[in-house]
Protein backbone atom coordinates (compact mmCIF):
# COMPACT_ATOMS: atom_id res chain seq x y z
CA UNK A 1 0.00 0.00 0.00
CA UNK A 2 2.80 2.42 0.89
CA UNK A 3 4.45 2.03 -2.52
CA UNK A 4 1.13 2.60 -4.28
CA UNK A 5 0.45 5.78 -2.33
CA UNK A 6 3.95 7.13 -2.99
CA UNK A 7 3.66 6.39 -6.72
CA UNK A 8 0.33 8.23 -6.89
CA UNK A 9 1.79 11.20 -4.99
CA UNK A 10 4.80 11.43 -7.30
CA UNK A 11 2.63 11.20 -10.41
CA UNK A 12 0.37 13.95 -9.03
CA UNK A 13 3.36 16.20 -8.25
CA UNK A 14 4.90 15.68 -11.69
CA UNK A 15 1.57 16.35 -13.42
CA UNK A 16 0.99 19.53 -11.41
CA UNK A 17 4.41 20.95 -12.28
CA UNK A 18 4.10 20.03 -15.97
CA UNK A 19 0.69 21.67 -16.25
CA UNK A 20 1.82 24.79 -14.43
CA UNK A 21 5.07 25.28 -16.34
CA UNK A 22 3.52 24.76 -19.78
CA UNK A 23 2.41 28.37 -19.84
CA UNK A 24 5.29 30.84 -20.45
CA UNK A 25 6.04 33.60 -18.01
CA UNK A 26 5.61 31.53 -14.87
CA UNK A 27 9.12 32.26 -13.62
CA UNK A 28 10.02 35.55 -15.31
CA UNK A 29 8.63 37.85 -17.98
CA UNK A 30 9.63 40.85 -20.07
CA UNK A 31 7.88 44.18 -19.54
CA UNK A 32 8.86 47.67 -20.72
CA UNK A 33 12.48 46.90 -21.43
CA UNK A 34 13.19 44.88 -18.31
CA UNK A 35 12.98 41.28 -17.14
CA UNK A 36 10.84 40.89 -14.02
CA UNK A 37 10.47 37.90 -11.72
CA UNK A 38 7.03 36.58 -10.86
CA UNK A 39 5.74 36.30 -7.31
CA UNK A 40 6.35 32.55 -7.49
CA UNK A 41 10.01 33.04 -8.35
CA UNK A 42 10.78 35.27 -5.37
CA UNK A 43 8.68 33.00 -3.15
CA UNK A 44 10.72 29.97 -4.24
CA UNK A 45 14.00 31.84 -3.69
CA UNK A 46 12.94 32.56 -0.11
CA UNK A 47 11.41 29.11 0.32
CA UNK A 48 14.71 27.39 -0.43
CA UNK A 49 16.38 29.66 2.11
CA UNK A 50 13.70 29.23 4.78
CA UNK A 51 13.28 25.49 4.21
CA UNK A 52 16.91 24.81 5.12
CA UNK A 53 16.02 25.61 8.73
CA UNK A 54 14.08 22.35 9.00
CA UNK A 55 17.36 20.44 8.93
CA UNK A 56 18.61 21.92 12.21
CA UNK A 57 15.86 23.93 13.95
CA UNK A 58 13.65 21.04 15.24
CA UNK A 59 16.58 19.43 17.07
CA UNK A 60 17.59 22.79 18.56
CA UNK A 61 14.01 23.45 19.71
CA UNK A 62 13.75 19.98 21.28
CA UNK A 63 17.02 20.54 23.10
CA UNK A 64 15.54 23.54 24.95
CA UNK A 65 11.83 22.81 25.46
CA UNK A 66 11.56 19.05 25.01
CA UNK A 67 8.45 17.34 23.56
CA UNK A 68 6.42 20.58 23.57
CA UNK A 69 8.54 21.64 20.57
CA UNK A 70 6.05 19.64 18.47
CA UNK A 71 3.28 22.09 19.41
CA UNK A 72 5.26 25.31 19.53
CA UNK A 73 6.97 24.84 16.16
CA UNK A 74 3.46 24.66 14.66
CA UNK A 75 2.24 27.70 16.63
CA UNK A 76 5.35 29.68 15.71
CA UNK A 77 4.66 28.89 12.04
CA UNK A 78 1.25 30.56 12.34
CA UNK A 79 2.65 33.48 14.34
CA UNK A 80 5.55 34.21 11.98
CA UNK A 81 3.55 33.91 8.78
CA UNK A 82 0.79 36.09 10.20
CA UNK A 83 3.53 38.61 11.02
CA UNK A 84 4.50 38.65 7.33
CA UNK A 85 1.35 40.67 6.60
CA UNK A 86 3.32 43.51 8.20
CA UNK A 87 6.18 42.80 5.80
CA UNK A 88 3.74 43.30 2.92
CA UNK A 89 2.70 46.61 4.45
CA UNK A 90 6.34 47.67 4.70
CA UNK A 91 6.88 46.75 1.03
CA UNK A 92 3.89 48.93 0.12
CA UNK A 93 5.26 51.87 2.13
CA UNK A 94 8.73 51.55 0.59
CA UNK A 95 7.26 51.48 -2.92
CA UNK A 96 5.16 54.56 -2.11
CA UNK A 97 8.35 56.44 -1.15
CA UNK A 98 10.30 55.14 -4.15
CA UNK A 99 12.64 53.02 -2.01
CA UNK A 100 12.79 49.77 -3.96
CA UNK A 101 14.88 47.03 -2.36
CA UNK A 102 16.98 47.25 0.76
CA UNK A 103 14.25 45.75 2.93
CA UNK A 104 14.76 46.28 6.65
CA UNK A 105 17.61 48.75 6.18
CA UNK A 106 15.69 51.02 3.78
CA UNK A 107 12.62 51.06 6.01
CA UNK A 108 14.52 51.69 9.23
CA UNK A 109 16.49 54.45 7.44
CA UNK A 110 13.24 56.07 6.29
CA UNK A 111 11.63 55.94 9.73
CA UNK A 112 14.48 56.09 12.24
CA UNK A 113 17.18 58.02 10.42
CA UNK A 114 20.82 57.24 9.62
CA UNK A 115 22.07 56.61 13.16
CA UNK A 116 19.46 54.14 14.40
CA UNK A 117 19.28 52.43 11.01
CA UNK A 118 22.81 51.18 11.62
CA UNK A 119 21.33 48.98 14.36
CA UNK A 120 19.23 47.38 11.62
CA UNK A 121 22.33 47.00 9.45
CA UNK A 122 24.12 45.28 12.32
CA UNK A 123 21.21 42.91 13.00
CA UNK A 124 20.83 42.02 9.34
CA UNK A 125 24.57 41.43 8.98
CA UNK A 126 24.52 39.13 12.02
CA UNK A 127 21.70 37.20 10.33
CA UNK A 128 23.64 36.85 7.09
CA UNK A 129 26.87 35.90 8.87
CA UNK A 130 25.16 33.22 10.91
CA UNK A 131 23.10 32.00 7.96
CA UNK A 132 26.34 31.29 6.14
CA UNK A 133 28.02 29.76 9.19
CA UNK A 134 25.23 27.52 10.46
CA UNK A 135 24.24 26.45 6.93
CA UNK A 136 27.79 25.40 6.05
CA UNK A 137 28.14 23.51 9.36
CA UNK A 138 24.77 21.80 8.92
CA UNK A 139 25.61 20.96 5.29
CA UNK A 140 28.74 19.10 6.42
CA UNK A 141 26.92 17.34 9.28
CA UNK A 142 24.23 16.09 6.90
CA UNK A 143 26.74 15.12 4.20
CA UNK A 144 28.82 13.10 6.68
CA UNK A 145 25.80 11.52 8.37
CA UNK A 146 26.61 8.15 6.79
CA UNK A 147 30.37 8.71 6.69
CA UNK A 148 31.52 9.94 10.13
CA UNK A 149 34.70 12.03 10.09
CA UNK A 150 36.98 13.68 12.64
CA UNK A 151 36.09 17.17 13.84
CA UNK A 152 39.18 18.67 12.17
CA UNK A 153 38.12 17.24 8.81
CA UNK A 154 34.63 18.67 9.29
CA UNK A 155 36.10 22.10 10.06
CA UNK A 156 38.20 21.99 6.90
CA UNK A 157 35.12 21.08 4.84
CA UNK A 158 33.07 23.90 6.41
CA UNK A 159 35.76 26.49 5.63
CA UNK A 160 36.12 24.96 2.18
CA UNK A 161 32.42 25.53 1.48
CA UNK A 162 32.64 29.18 2.57
CA UNK A 163 35.68 29.96 0.43
CA UNK A 164 34.36 27.96 -2.54
CA UNK A 165 31.15 30.02 -2.51
CA UNK A 166 33.22 33.20 -2.14
CA UNK A 167 35.30 32.15 -5.14
CA UNK A 168 32.19 31.49 -7.24
CA UNK A 169 30.83 34.94 -6.45
CA UNK A 170 34.18 36.59 -7.19
CA UNK A 171 34.23 34.81 -10.57
CA UNK A 172 30.71 36.05 -11.23
CA UNK A 173 29.09 32.60 -11.16
CA UNK A 174 25.58 33.11 -9.83
CA UNK A 175 22.50 30.99 -9.47
CA UNK A 176 19.40 32.23 -11.26
CA UNK A 177 15.68 31.88 -10.69
CA UNK A 178 15.33 28.94 -13.09
CA UNK A 179 18.05 26.95 -11.36
CA UNK A 180 16.50 27.66 -7.95
CA UNK A 181 13.09 26.61 -9.28
CA UNK A 182 14.57 23.32 -10.52
CA UNK A 183 15.98 22.63 -7.06
CA UNK A 184 12.58 23.52 -5.59
CA UNK A 185 10.89 20.90 -7.78
CA UNK A 186 13.35 18.26 -6.58
CA UNK A 187 12.82 19.35 -2.96
CA UNK A 188 9.04 19.16 -3.39
CA UNK A 189 9.30 15.50 -4.44
CA UNK A 190 11.60 14.65 -1.52
CA UNK A 191 9.64 16.42 1.22
CA UNK A 192 6.21 15.23 0.11
CA UNK A 193 7.51 11.66 -0.08
CA UNK A 194 9.05 12.07 3.37
CA UNK A 195 5.81 13.42 4.85
CA UNK A 196 3.65 10.76 3.20
CA UNK A 197 5.99 7.97 4.34
CA UNK A 198 6.07 9.37 7.86
CA UNK A 199 2.28 9.54 8.10
CA UNK A 200 1.88 6.00 6.74
CA UNK A 201 4.48 4.70 9.23
CA UNK A 202 2.85 6.30 12.26
CA UNK A 203 2.26 3.68 14.94
CA UNK A 204 0.82 3.71 18.43
CA UNK A 205 4.11 4.75 20.01
CA UNK A 206 4.51 7.72 17.64
CA UNK A 207 0.94 8.87 18.24
CA UNK A 208 1.58 8.59 21.98
CA UNK A 209 4.65 10.83 21.61
CA UNK A 210 2.57 13.39 19.71
CA UNK A 211 0.00 13.36 22.50
CA UNK A 212 2.80 13.64 25.04
CA UNK A 213 4.08 16.74 23.24
CA UNK A 214 0.63 18.37 23.34
CA UNK A 215 0.20 17.42 27.01
CA UNK A 216 3.68 18.70 27.86
CA UNK A 217 2.98 22.06 26.19
CA UNK A 218 -0.41 22.38 27.93
CA UNK A 219 0.99 21.56 31.36
CA UNK A 220 3.83 24.08 30.99
CA UNK A 221 1.36 26.82 30.07
CA UNK A 222 -0.96 25.97 32.98
CA UNK A 223 1.68 25.95 35.70
CA UNK A 224 2.35 28.91 38.00
CA UNK A 225 1.23 32.54 37.82
CA UNK A 226 0.40 34.40 34.62
CA UNK A 227 3.91 35.87 34.66
CA UNK A 228 5.38 32.37 34.77
CA UNK A 229 3.09 31.26 31.96
CA UNK A 230 4.07 34.24 29.83
CA UNK A 231 7.73 33.45 30.48
CA UNK A 232 7.15 29.85 29.35
CA UNK A 233 5.27 31.09 26.27
CA UNK A 234 8.07 33.49 25.30
CA UNK A 235 10.78 30.91 25.98
CA UNK A 236 8.98 28.40 23.76
CA UNK A 237 8.54 30.79 20.83
CA UNK A 238 12.12 32.02 21.14
CA UNK A 239 13.34 28.41 21.03
CA UNK A 240 11.35 27.68 17.85
CA UNK A 241 11.84 30.95 15.95
CA UNK A 242 14.89 29.57 14.17
CA UNK A 243 12.66 27.19 12.19
CA UNK A 244 11.46 30.15 10.10
CA UNK A 245 14.67 32.08 9.54
CA UNK A 246 14.86 33.64 6.11
CA UNK A 247 11.20 34.67 5.95
CA UNK A 248 12.24 38.33 5.75
CA UNK A 249 14.16 37.66 2.51
CA UNK A 250 11.08 38.28 0.35
CA UNK A 251 11.20 41.93 1.37
CA UNK A 252 14.83 42.11 0.24
CA UNK A 253 13.81 40.97 -3.28
CA UNK A 254 11.24 43.73 -3.79
CA UNK A 255 13.41 45.28 -6.50
CA UNK A 256 12.98 42.18 -8.67
CA UNK A 257 9.19 42.43 -8.99
CA UNK A 258 6.91 45.13 -10.38
CA UNK A 259 4.70 45.77 -7.37
CA UNK A 260 4.36 45.25 -3.64
CA UNK A 261 1.32 43.08 -4.43
CA UNK A 262 3.72 40.42 -5.73
CA UNK A 263 5.34 40.44 -2.28
CA UNK A 264 1.95 39.73 -0.73
CA UNK A 265 1.32 36.77 -3.03
CA UNK A 266 4.78 35.38 -2.27
CA UNK A 267 4.13 35.50 1.48
CA UNK A 268 0.79 33.70 1.06
CA UNK A 269 2.60 30.97 -0.90
CA UNK A 270 5.21 30.64 1.85
CA UNK A 271 2.51 30.35 4.51
CA UNK A 272 0.86 27.51 2.57
CA UNK A 273 4.13 25.67 1.89
CA UNK A 274 6.86 26.23 4.48
CA UNK A 275 4.22 27.14 7.06
CA UNK A 276 2.77 23.63 6.71
CA UNK A 277 5.78 21.53 5.68
CA UNK A 278 8.16 22.61 8.46
CA UNK A 279 5.84 21.87 11.45
CA UNK A 280 4.67 18.62 9.83
CA UNK A 281 8.19 17.30 9.21
CA UNK A 282 9.26 18.47 12.67
CA UNK A 283 6.30 16.73 14.34
CA UNK A 284 6.93 13.47 12.49
CA UNK A 285 10.66 13.48 13.25
CA UNK A 286 10.22 14.43 16.92
CA UNK A 287 7.62 11.68 17.40
CA UNK A 288 9.95 9.01 16.00
CA UNK A 289 11.99 6.62 18.22
CA UNK A 290 15.24 8.60 17.93
CA UNK A 291 17.93 9.45 20.47
CA UNK A 292 17.95 13.19 19.74
CA UNK A 293 21.19 13.81 21.62
CA UNK A 294 23.01 11.68 19.02
CA UNK A 295 21.36 13.26 15.97
CA UNK A 296 21.19 17.01 16.58
CA UNK A 297 23.05 17.70 13.34
CA UNK A 298 21.32 15.17 11.08
CA UNK A 299 17.88 14.62 12.64
CA UNK A 300 15.84 14.83 9.42
CA UNK A 301 18.36 12.76 7.46
CA UNK A 302 18.30 10.03 10.10
CA UNK A 303 14.50 10.13 10.24
CA UNK A 304 14.35 9.71 6.45
CA UNK A 305 16.50 6.59 6.83
CA UNK A 306 14.06 5.17 9.38
CA UNK A 307 10.98 5.59 7.19
CA UNK A 308 12.33 4.75 3.71
CA UNK A 309 15.72 3.12 4.12
CA UNK A 310 19.33 4.15 3.77
CA UNK A 311 19.15 5.08 0.07
CA UNK A 312 16.35 7.58 0.71
CA UNK A 313 18.33 8.89 3.68
CA UNK A 314 21.32 9.51 1.42
CA UNK A 315 19.08 11.37 -1.05
CA UNK A 316 17.69 13.55 1.76
CA UNK A 317 21.23 14.16 3.04
CA UNK A 318 22.25 15.22 -0.47
CA UNK A 319 19.27 17.58 -0.75
CA UNK A 320 19.99 19.00 2.71
CA UNK A 321 23.65 19.64 1.94
CA UNK A 322 22.91 21.16 -1.46
CA UNK A 323 20.09 23.39 -0.15
CA UNK A 324 22.22 24.51 2.78
CA UNK A 325 25.11 25.37 0.46
CA UNK A 326 22.64 27.43 -1.60
CA UNK A 327 21.72 29.23 1.63
CA UNK A 328 25.42 30.05 2.12
CA UNK A 329 25.46 31.57 -1.35
CA UNK A 330 22.29 33.53 -0.56
CA UNK A 331 24.02 34.96 2.52
CA UNK A 332 27.01 36.04 0.41
CA UNK A 333 24.83 37.71 -2.22
CA UNK A 334 22.44 39.38 0.23
CA UNK A 335 25.19 40.69 2.52
CA UNK A 336 27.13 42.08 -0.44
CA UNK A 337 24.00 43.87 -1.69
CA UNK A 338 23.39 45.35 1.76
CA UNK A 339 26.99 46.54 2.12
CA UNK A 340 26.90 47.91 -1.43
CA UNK A 341 23.75 49.91 -0.66
CA UNK A 342 25.23 51.36 2.53
CA UNK A 343 28.62 52.06 0.90
CA UNK A 344 26.97 53.77 -2.07
CA UNK A 345 24.78 55.90 0.19
CA UNK A 346 27.76 57.10 2.23
CA UNK A 347 30.27 57.43 -0.61
CA UNK A 348 32.65 54.51 0.12
CA UNK A 349 33.15 53.80 -3.56
CA UNK A 350 36.47 51.95 -3.06
CA UNK A 351 34.58 49.19 -1.27
CA UNK A 352 32.13 48.57 -4.10
CA UNK A 353 34.72 48.41 -6.88
CA UNK A 354 34.04 45.50 -9.26
CA UNK A 355 36.32 43.23 -11.25
CA UNK A 356 36.04 42.31 -14.93
CA UNK A 357 33.15 39.96 -14.13
CA UNK A 358 31.19 42.73 -12.39
CA UNK A 359 31.68 41.10 -8.99
CA UNK A 360 31.98 42.97 -5.69
CA UNK A 361 35.13 41.00 -5.01
CA UNK A 362 36.38 43.10 -2.09
CA UNK A 363 33.13 42.66 -0.20
CA UNK A 364 33.09 38.90 -0.91
CA UNK A 365 36.64 38.52 0.42
CA UNK A 366 35.80 40.49 3.57
CA UNK A 367 32.66 38.40 4.06
CA UNK A 368 34.58 35.13 3.68
CA UNK A 369 37.16 36.28 6.22
CA UNK A 370 34.46 37.29 8.68
CA UNK A 371 32.46 34.08 8.20
CA UNK A 372 35.61 32.00 8.66
CA UNK A 373 36.53 33.84 11.86
CA UNK A 374 33.11 33.05 13.36
CA UNK A 375 33.50 29.37 12.42
CA UNK A 376 36.92 29.26 14.09
CA UNK A 377 35.74 31.11 17.20
CA UNK A 378 32.78 28.78 17.69
CA UNK A 379 34.74 25.70 16.55
CA UNK A 380 31.90 24.92 14.16
CA UNK A 381 29.43 24.22 16.98
CA UNK A 382 25.89 24.15 15.59
CA UNK A 383 24.51 24.72 19.10
CA UNK A 384 26.46 27.96 19.67
CA UNK A 385 25.73 29.22 16.14
CA UNK A 386 22.01 28.52 16.60
CA UNK A 387 22.01 30.51 19.85
CA UNK A 388 23.61 33.47 18.07
CA UNK A 389 21.38 33.22 15.02
CA UNK A 390 18.09 33.32 16.93
CA UNK A 391 19.06 36.55 18.71
CA UNK A 392 19.97 38.42 15.52
CA UNK A 393 16.83 37.16 13.78
CA UNK A 394 14.51 38.39 16.51
CA UNK A 395 16.38 41.72 16.67
CA UNK A 396 15.59 42.25 12.97
CA UNK A 397 11.92 41.38 13.49
CA UNK A 398 11.73 43.76 16.47
CA UNK A 399 13.23 46.63 14.45
CA UNK A 400 10.79 45.96 11.60
CA UNK A 401 7.71 45.98 13.81
CA UNK A 402 8.93 48.95 15.87
CA UNK A 403 9.63 51.00 12.74
CA UNK A 404 6.17 50.18 11.36
CA UNK A 405 4.49 51.27 14.60
CA UNK A 406 6.43 54.56 14.58
CA UNK A 407 5.62 55.18 10.90
CA UNK A 408 1.91 54.62 11.43
CA UNK A 409 1.96 56.83 14.54
CA UNK A 410 3.23 59.78 12.51
CA UNK A 411 1.80 59.06 9.05
CA UNK A 412 -1.32 56.97 9.64
CA UNK A 413 -2.78 55.19 6.61
CA UNK A 414 -3.54 58.24 4.46
CA UNK A 415 -0.37 57.92 2.38
CA UNK A 416 -0.80 54.21 1.62
CA UNK A 417 -4.46 53.25 1.69
CA UNK A 418 -4.78 49.96 -0.31
CA UNK A 419 -3.28 47.71 2.37
CA UNK A 420 -2.79 48.36 6.07
CA UNK A 421 -2.85 46.21 9.18
CA UNK A 422 -4.20 46.61 12.68
CA UNK A 423 -1.77 48.67 14.75
CA UNK A 424 -2.83 47.18 18.08
CA UNK A 425 -2.00 43.68 16.85
CA UNK A 426 1.28 45.00 15.41
CA UNK A 427 2.09 46.39 18.85
CA UNK A 428 1.33 43.01 20.46
CA UNK A 429 3.57 41.26 17.92
CA UNK A 430 6.35 43.74 18.69
CA UNK A 431 5.96 43.11 22.44
CA UNK A 432 6.30 39.35 21.85
CA UNK A 433 9.45 39.83 19.75
CA UNK A 434 11.03 42.20 22.27
CA UNK A 435 10.22 39.73 25.05
CA UNK A 436 11.85 36.94 23.03
CA UNK A 437 14.89 39.13 22.47
CA UNK A 438 15.23 39.87 26.19
CA UNK A 439 14.86 36.16 27.01
CA UNK A 440 17.52 35.13 24.50
CA UNK A 441 19.84 37.95 25.52
CA UNK A 442 19.74 36.69 29.10
CA UNK A 443 19.85 32.96 28.35
CA UNK A 444 22.22 32.96 25.35
CA UNK A 445 25.42 34.79 26.37
CA UNK A 446 27.27 33.81 23.17
CA UNK A 447 24.60 35.29 20.94
CA UNK A 448 24.32 38.38 23.11
CA UNK A 449 28.07 38.98 22.97
CA UNK A 450 28.22 38.65 19.19
CA UNK A 451 25.15 40.78 18.53
CA UNK A 452 26.24 43.46 21.00
CA UNK A 453 29.81 43.48 19.65
CA UNK A 454 28.82 43.76 16.00
CA UNK A 455 26.09 46.29 16.78
CA UNK A 456 28.49 48.38 18.85
CA UNK A 457 31.16 48.36 16.15
CA UNK A 458 28.69 49.21 13.38
CA UNK A 459 27.02 51.91 15.47
CA UNK A 460 30.37 53.51 16.29
CA UNK A 461 31.41 53.41 12.65
CA UNK A 462 27.96 54.64 11.64
CA UNK A 463 28.20 57.57 14.03
CA UNK A 464 31.54 58.63 12.55
CA UNK A 465 30.31 58.15 8.99
CA UNK A 466 26.95 59.85 9.53
CA UNK A 467 28.68 62.93 10.94
CA UNK A 468 30.62 63.54 7.72
CA UNK A 469 29.12 61.50 4.88
CA UNK A 470 25.38 61.25 5.52
CA UNK A 471 23.31 62.18 2.41
CA UNK A 472 21.21 64.40 4.67
CA UNK A 473 24.14 66.80 5.03
CA UNK A 474 23.74 67.97 1.43
CA UNK A 475 19.99 68.39 1.92
CA UNK A 476 20.49 70.34 5.15
CA UNK A 477 22.90 72.66 3.32
CA UNK A 478 20.03 73.65 1.02
CA UNK A 479 17.82 74.69 3.92
CA UNK A 480 16.96 78.25 4.84
CA UNK A 481 17.65 79.67 8.29
CA UNK A 482 15.61 81.60 10.82
CA UNK A 483 17.73 84.69 10.07
CA UNK A 484 16.79 84.45 6.37
CA UNK A 485 13.19 84.61 7.54
CA UNK A 486 13.85 87.63 9.78
CA UNK A 487 15.77 89.54 7.07
CA UNK A 488 12.94 88.97 4.62
CA UNK A 489 10.28 90.22 7.03
CA UNK A 490 12.46 93.18 8.08
CA UNK A 491 12.18 94.60 4.55
CA UNK A 492 8.50 95.26 5.17
CA UNK A 493 7.35 98.42 6.94
CA UNK A 494 3.94 96.96 7.73
CA UNK A 495 3.05 96.89 11.45
CA UNK A 496 1.79 93.30 11.17
CA UNK A 497 3.79 90.16 10.35
CA UNK A 498 2.04 87.00 9.20
CA UNK A 499 3.57 83.54 9.53
CA UNK A 500 1.99 80.65 7.61
CA UNK A 501 3.10 77.14 8.53
CA UNK A 502 2.67 74.88 5.50
CA UNK A 503 2.78 71.14 5.08
CA UNK A 504 5.50 69.93 2.67
CA UNK A 505 3.02 69.33 -0.18
CA UNK A 506 0.86 72.45 0.27
CA UNK A 507 1.30 74.86 -2.64
CA UNK A 508 -1.67 77.21 -3.01
CA UNK A 509 -1.72 80.79 -1.73
CA UNK A 510 -2.55 84.22 -3.01
CA UNK A 511 -0.20 86.97 -4.15
CA UNK A 512 2.92 87.01 -1.97
CA UNK A 513 3.30 90.06 0.29
CA UNK A 514 6.51 91.30 1.90
CA UNK A 515 5.08 91.05 5.42
CA UNK A 516 4.15 87.38 4.98
CA UNK A 517 6.34 84.32 5.37
CA UNK A 518 5.45 80.76 4.43
CA UNK A 519 7.34 78.14 6.40
CA UNK A 520 7.71 74.45 5.59
CA UNK A 521 9.46 71.96 7.83
CA UNK A 522 10.81 68.86 6.11
CA UNK A 523 12.81 65.73 6.80
CA UNK A 524 16.22 65.74 5.06
CA UNK A 525 15.79 61.99 4.39
CA UNK A 526 12.91 62.79 2.02
CA UNK A 527 14.66 65.59 0.17
CA UNK A 528 14.31 69.38 0.18
CA UNK A 529 10.91 70.60 -1.09
CA UNK A 530 10.81 73.00 -4.03
CA UNK A 531 10.99 76.72 -3.13
CA UNK A 532 7.65 78.13 -4.25
CA UNK A 533 8.36 81.85 -3.78
CA UNK A 534 10.89 84.29 -2.38
CA UNK A 535 9.02 84.37 0.92
CA UNK A 536 8.80 80.57 1.18
CA UNK A 537 11.29 79.25 3.75
CA UNK A 538 12.20 75.57 4.09
CA UNK A 539 13.60 74.53 7.47
CA UNK A 540 15.05 71.07 8.04
CA UNK A 541 13.99 68.84 10.94
CA UNK A 542 17.49 67.60 11.68
CA UNK A 543 17.80 66.87 15.40
CA UNK A 544 14.50 68.06 16.86
CA UNK A 545 10.80 67.42 16.47
CA UNK A 546 8.27 69.60 14.68
CA UNK A 547 6.90 71.33 17.77
CA UNK A 548 10.39 72.28 18.98
CA UNK A 549 11.21 73.81 15.59
CA UNK A 550 7.97 75.83 15.56
CA UNK A 551 8.78 77.02 19.06
CA UNK A 552 12.30 78.04 18.00
CA UNK A 553 11.02 80.06 15.02
CA UNK A 554 8.45 81.89 17.13
CA UNK A 555 11.03 82.75 19.80
CA UNK A 556 13.38 84.20 17.17
CA UNK A 557 10.56 86.30 15.70
CA UNK A 558 9.51 87.46 19.18
CA UNK A 559 13.08 88.50 20.00
CA UNK A 560 13.94 90.16 16.68
CA UNK A 561 10.58 91.90 16.09
CA UNK A 562 9.23 93.04 19.47
CA UNK A 563 7.44 96.04 17.92
CA UNK A 564 5.43 94.08 15.33
CA UNK A 565 2.01 92.46 15.67
CA UNK A 566 2.59 88.80 14.82
CA UNK A 567 -0.19 86.55 13.51
CA UNK A 568 0.47 82.84 13.20
CA UNK A 569 -1.59 80.71 10.79
CA UNK A 570 -1.65 76.95 11.18
CA UNK A 571 -3.58 74.73 8.78
CA UNK A 572 -6.56 72.78 10.03
CA UNK A 573 -5.54 69.12 10.52
CA UNK A 574 -7.56 67.00 8.08
CA UNK A 575 -6.21 63.59 9.07
CA UNK A 576 -8.07 61.39 11.52
CA UNK A 577 -6.61 61.76 15.00
CA UNK A 578 -7.18 58.06 15.57
CA UNK A 579 -5.43 57.22 12.31
CA UNK A 580 -2.48 59.56 12.85
CA UNK A 581 -2.12 59.70 16.61
CA UNK A 582 0.70 62.21 16.24
CA UNK A 583 -1.83 64.77 14.94
CA UNK A 584 -3.69 64.67 18.25
CA UNK A 585 -0.44 64.95 20.19
CA UNK A 586 0.69 67.85 17.98
CA UNK A 587 -2.58 69.78 18.41
CA UNK A 588 -2.36 69.24 22.16
CA UNK A 589 1.13 70.79 22.12
CA UNK A 590 0.03 73.68 19.89
CA UNK A 591 -2.56 74.62 22.51
CA UNK A 592 0.33 75.74 24.72
CA UNK A 593 1.54 78.38 22.25
CA UNK A 594 -0.85 81.24 23.26
CA UNK A 595 0.39 80.98 26.84
CA UNK A 596 4.02 81.01 25.72
CA UNK A 597 3.49 83.93 23.31
CA UNK A 598 0.65 86.04 24.76
CA UNK A 599 1.31 88.94 22.35
CA UNK A 600 0.88 86.79 19.23
CA UNK A 601 -2.37 86.00 17.47
CA UNK A 602 -2.94 82.35 16.55
CA UNK A 603 -5.30 81.01 13.89
CA UNK A 604 -5.98 77.37 13.10
CA UNK A 605 -8.13 77.67 10.02
CA UNK A 606 -9.45 75.84 6.98
CA UNK A 607 -9.75 78.10 3.89
CA UNK A 608 -12.44 75.98 2.19
CA UNK A 609 -12.64 74.85 -1.41
CA UNK A 610 -14.78 77.71 -2.62
CA UNK A 611 -18.10 77.62 -4.49
CA UNK A 612 -18.02 76.73 -8.17
Kindly give the residue locations of the regions a language model identified.
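Cytosolic C-terminal regulatory domains/tails of membrane transporters and channels
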Residues: 5, 9, 67, 480-612
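Membrane-interface loop-to-helix entry segments
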Residues: 3-13, 157-214, 267-271, 386-399, ...
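TM-loop-TM module centered on a large, flexible mid-protein loop between adjacent transmembrane helices
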Residues: 103-109, 113, 266-327, 348-379, ...
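Extracellular loop-to-transmembrane helix junctions
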Residues: 2-21, 31-34, 59-109, 115-123, ...
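Membrane-helix boundary/coupling elements in multi-pass transport proteins
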Residues: 50, 55-58, 120-141, 239-257, ...
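Helix-loop-helix junctions that connect adjacent transmembrane segments
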Residues: 29-32, 185-252, 256-259, 272-276, ...
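C-terminal membrane-solvent junction of multi-pass transporters and transport-like membrane proteins
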Residues: 351-362, 397-446, 476-478, 484-486
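Hydrophobic alpha-helical segments and their helix-loop junctions in multi-pass secondary transporters
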Residues: 16-23, 185-220, 282-289, 400-414, ...
Amino acid sequence: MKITVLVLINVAIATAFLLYLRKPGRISYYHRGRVWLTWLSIAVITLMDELTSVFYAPAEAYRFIGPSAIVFIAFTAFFIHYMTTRMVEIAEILEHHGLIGGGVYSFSYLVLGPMVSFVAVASIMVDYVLTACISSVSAVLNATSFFPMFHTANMVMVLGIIWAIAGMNILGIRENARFTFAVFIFAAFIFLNLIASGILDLDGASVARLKEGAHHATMRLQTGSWITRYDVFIASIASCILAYSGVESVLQTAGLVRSWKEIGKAYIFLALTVGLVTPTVAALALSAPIDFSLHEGDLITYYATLVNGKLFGIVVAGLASFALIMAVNTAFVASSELIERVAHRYGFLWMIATNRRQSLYRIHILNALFFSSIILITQGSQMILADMYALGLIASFSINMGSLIIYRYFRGTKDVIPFNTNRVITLLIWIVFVSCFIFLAIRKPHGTMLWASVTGIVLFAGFLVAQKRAPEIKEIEKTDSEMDLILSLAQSSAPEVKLFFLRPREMAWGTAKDNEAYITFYSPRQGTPHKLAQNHFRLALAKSDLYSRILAVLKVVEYEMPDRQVTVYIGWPMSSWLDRISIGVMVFKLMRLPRLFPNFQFNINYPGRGIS
